[in-house]
Amino acid sequence: AVNKAEEPQNPPQLGHLAIIKPLVYLTLRLSLPDALIRLPSGSRLCTRRSSGAAAPGSGATIFALSSGQGRCGIAVIRTSGPSSGHALRILTAARDLPPARHASLRLLSDPRSGEPLDRALVLWFPGPRSFTGEDCVEFHVHGGPAVVSGVLQALGSVPGLRPAEAGEFTRRAFANGKLNLTEVEGLADLIHAETEAQRRQALRQLDGELGHLCRGWAETLTKALAHVEAYIDFGEDDNLEEGVLEQADIEVRALEVALGAHLRDARRGQRLRSGAHVVVTGPPNAGKSSLVNLLSRKPVSIVSPEPGTTRDVLETPVDLAGFPVLLSDTAGLREGVGPVEQEGVRRARESCNFLATVVASVGAQSPSDSSQRLLLVLNKSDLLSPEGPGPRPDLPPHLLLSCLTGEGLDGLLEALRKELAAVCGDPSTGSPLLTRARHQHHLQGCLDALSHYKPSKDLALAAEALRVARGHLTRLTGGGGTEEILDIIFRDFCVGK
Amino acid sequence: MFYLRGCGRWVAASFTKQQFPLVRLSSDSAAPRTPHFDVIVIGGGHAGTEAATAAARCGSRTLLLTHRVDTIGQMSCNPSFGGIGKGHLMREVDALDGLCSRICDQSGVHYKVLNRRKGPAVWGLRAQIDRKLYKQNMQKEILNTPLLTVQEGAVEDLILTEPEPEHTGKCRVSGVVLVDGSTVYAESVILTTGTFLRGMIVIGLEMHPAGRLGDQPSIGLAQTLEKLGFVVGRLKTGTPPRIAKDSINFSILNKQTPDNPSVPFSFTNETVWIKPEDQLPCYLTYTNPRVDEIVLNNLHLNSHVKETTRGPRYCPSIESKVLRFPNRLHQVWLEPEGMDSDLIYPQGLSMTLPTELQEKMITCIRGLEKAKVIQPGYGVQYDYLDPRQITPSLETHLVQRLFFAGQINGTTGYEEAAAQGVIAGINASLRVSRKPPFVVSRTEGYIGVLIDDLTTLGTSEPYRMFTSRVEFRLSLRPDNADIRLTLRGYKDAGCVSQQRYERACWMKSSLEEGISVLKSIEFSSSKWKNLIPEVSISTSRSLPVRALDVLKYEEVDMDSLAKAVPEPLKKYTKCRELAERLKIEATYESVLFHQLQEIKGVQQDEALQLPKDIDYLTIRDVSLSHEVREKLHFSRPQTIGAASRIPGVTPAAIINLLRFVKTTQQRQAAMNESPKTDQCLRNADRLQERQL
């Protein structure tokens, strides 16, 4: 039931529309939300490496949730790198490492608070006899989101550890000669899928308030850095305006305050949104809200016969066919209505705008290329007269449904189950838990780096602090090249002789 | 007209073939009396002189071909060397035993280190140079370089032969044809033609062909290169007018005095040739709204400014400054051109207005009210070759054994040219002796950043070095260029003298020893406070504090530390340079540790070499998009690291390439010991040794 999609605002013309006029399109768009924004390792490499963020070298120790996501009894979290043993000792509060390659039961606790996290099986694989050839640790923890999230955050707080980049475990294994060629074959496809999925995830994630914040911060920081760099490269001979450094200083300090406040706040406030993302979209009065209410078995959205009742994106977490799903109801896509509804339409488009291009370019031929899928649902089938003609035969594959009578619901659920299984079983989609750990890791890293910014002393050192801080932010937002810095310098200052 | 000196090394301007027997060095006794060299360098500018001497230092019989011998070492634009970023390049050129730093130590008239207060990683060694002295000293050095021959002549064409099968490229260069029809053969050829390729000088609406004011451009050579299939672009630059010194009223201007003591450019010099008190000052003045007015009212008379050819954003003409930043006062530095020169160089007034308007504008400026323009400012437009067509060893992809260095690759600046010159000279020589190329990585030096940027990203405006381009800026400092490059230059390139090598080795081991001693001395913070009362050591805990950490404080240097702990620290203060360098190492110690981790990561990618003979457009074993294939085909990255820096080359493509390298390696290993596999492995091994 994966369809080549019609542009939502431009539904296909039905031949016998006169008869089945009430039959309306609903498209269900499925995608995973909040999955890793892990930027693929290469995207960092493609920028000039001014980031200053940790490189995938032998130095850093990486960690990731390596079991699939979704509901599972046991989740496996892996680390690789020289600090693995150290991390294991810190989390188990033990002086000695467990015997190599033996499963041992240990109490894991948060090194910062001492709070117990889980009783878990831990395995210690000293290099080179390990998956990556480096020192590795596996934590087999109970699979609940709270436990997994807790352990990931605890690992992130250990100095020298950072969340893994896309494909980084495999890359390390490859570099250390631990993979044969057939194993690597799949890796490229995987990374490709990850890149594509992450691009959309990043877009989606960065659409929200947090993304807005991050981009703003990155912009401020890039500008401050550019001004400090201008002061270093040109300050001596050229007449930069007075107070360039002072202004940068003020901006950096303000940023520090904002980041600090956000991080303190984020620990309580950020809602963990786990599971696949299903967006219901279509023209007004198609019955999208009715479908959402039907699927969630509670009145999430107000329904009325009036077109344009839903004016915002309403999200509700539901259990669909055994999968955790975040179901979004959106405003009907139409033009020329009041400003509030237009905003709703804009948000609706935005919530799937990152799909539009993919849908158009991917089509039904290569659905595996994309984690984004589409189900075409024709609602109000109860209005079809049993003996009359059915929907036009040249329609793309679709499902018939009546939200009023519930007819066709089983078929829809079955189709959804298949789609969700495909989406959730897709190894390319990362865990939202890691996304959060990653966000926090980089924001904290940025804040730490900013605390080393002391322009009154060695300015090269101060600039380095800003470079590292910016590196952390641009890992979340993308960008981060040297050219951006030079562009700002030559835009803002008349330098050179 | 030119005299011969010293054992036939120096061949005076040879206008006729009859003089060639002097340089007949061909080993093939049956060959006709056609001159044959290991390396020919075309051009005697800053890239050419470094390239020729570097090749000769590496043991190659080298010929330097130039339009005019008396312009060798000419500083065609500003009368200064060094600066921020550029000074870094000069230190690296010097670390490879290049010339420009040593010559500057003998020819400067005003030495000043920029960025003194901003940290040693970004200090910019700079000097005003006496043009005449520089040229004299450079020519003396060139003429006394063993194995180096100099000849006057304009090159019209390249001699091309069948390619060597074991290398890529559609043909191989084996010599040059001069304008007079004579030929010279060589194993490698380096082109350092600067702005001479179809050079055009622009003043006002007048344009005439010239490489530099008064010099003929190279047109035949430009056509040859284009015919060979090189992608050619066009760039522009400019130079200000020169003003008569005695027509300037300096008394009302701000004076800038040189440093005391002067800091030399070269690692081998402890002082410069001239005392600070004998050096010349610079003066500062500003433009004003009347200057803006003249520019804006005469744009129709200024074809250079209107042209679309890309000029630099950072070395703008006064016209573009006025257009882009209106209603501001722009700085004008009045710089001496030399000890006995009557000219002043107004840095910041590069312009292409018609000559009479130039004087009119200049006399609007404070202090220059009565100034006389001796030579007008002018613009130059010239061809450059897209540098993505060369490898990091500066050899072209298209033509084997043909190397490009300097402005021909789209750079600007003497120092950028010199840096490429050294690398091209070394590699042209290594190519002759069939040794692996000498490539400086981004992690090793500014030279590496410069060449990597050019060869992987290309450039659309004249490329200039900035410290902000360098991601490992705190590691790649002016003070440690010798540790980074001299040892490698000696071992891998053979371009470094024994004496310099030994000095660098001594310095390296002394630094390492000094740092470990400083780490080993630990006292409580209260004891440190007693020992060095002037420093306020802030410690939150009562942990012992290392001497290295105390040395980080601004108020502390090796002298005060050695006074507090004479044994064993006293001996590290005997050598001034060592003491200063230990202080710098201490300043950056904590950051350098993190940076080293990152450098290792980059070097891992750099160690993964891509086979040179891949045809990216047709290769079947790798799944790559068409776009990626074209990009790889054009830039021909040599390592996975370089490939990953090309915009548009996706992570997936990188993984596919990785796989391809591995497969190729395995296949070659199976085919019993291929030199390429060896090389990959050797490079990986060398990485370990190369860590700072």
Curated annotation (Swiss-Prot), chain B:
Q: Which domain of life is it from?
A: Eukaryota
Provide the alphabetized UniProt keywords.
FAD, Flavoprotein, Methylation, Mitochondrion, Transit peptide, tRNA processing
Using the UniProt record, give the first listed, main subcellular location: mitochondrion
Question: Which PROSITE patterns does the entry link to?
Answer: GIDA_1, GIDA_2
Which reaction equation describes what this protein catalyses? 5,10-methylenetetrahydrofolate + uridine(34) in tRNA + taurine + GTP + A + H2O = 5-taurinomethyluridine(34) in tRNA + 7,8-dihydrofolate + GDP + AH2 + phosphate + H(+)
| Transit peptide feature range | 1-25
Residues modified to N6-methyllysine = K508
| GO BP | mitochondrial tRNA wobble uridine modification; tRNA methylation
Cofactors demanded by this protein: FAD
Coiled coil: which residue ranges?
Answer: none
Write out the biased-composition intervals (Basic and acidic residues).
683-692
Instruction: Briefly state the protein's biological role.
Output: Component of the GTPBP3-MTO1 complex that catalyzes the 5-taurinomethyluridine (taum(5)U) modification at the 34th wobble position (U34) of mitochondrial tRNAs (mt-tRNAs), which plays a role in mt-tRNA decoding and mitochondrial translation. Taum(5)U formation on mammalian mt-tRNA requires the presence of both GTPBP3-mediated GTPase activity and MTO1 catalytic activity.
The subunit structure is:
Homodimer; forms a dimer in the presence of potassium. Interacts with GTPBP3; forms the GTPBP3-MTO1 complex composed of homodimers of GTPBP3 and MTO1.
State the family it belongs to: Belongs to the MnmG family.
Q: What is this protein called?
A: 5-taurinomethyluridine-[tRNA] synthase subunit MTO1, mitochondrial
Organism source for this protein? Macaca fascicularis (Crab-eating macaque)
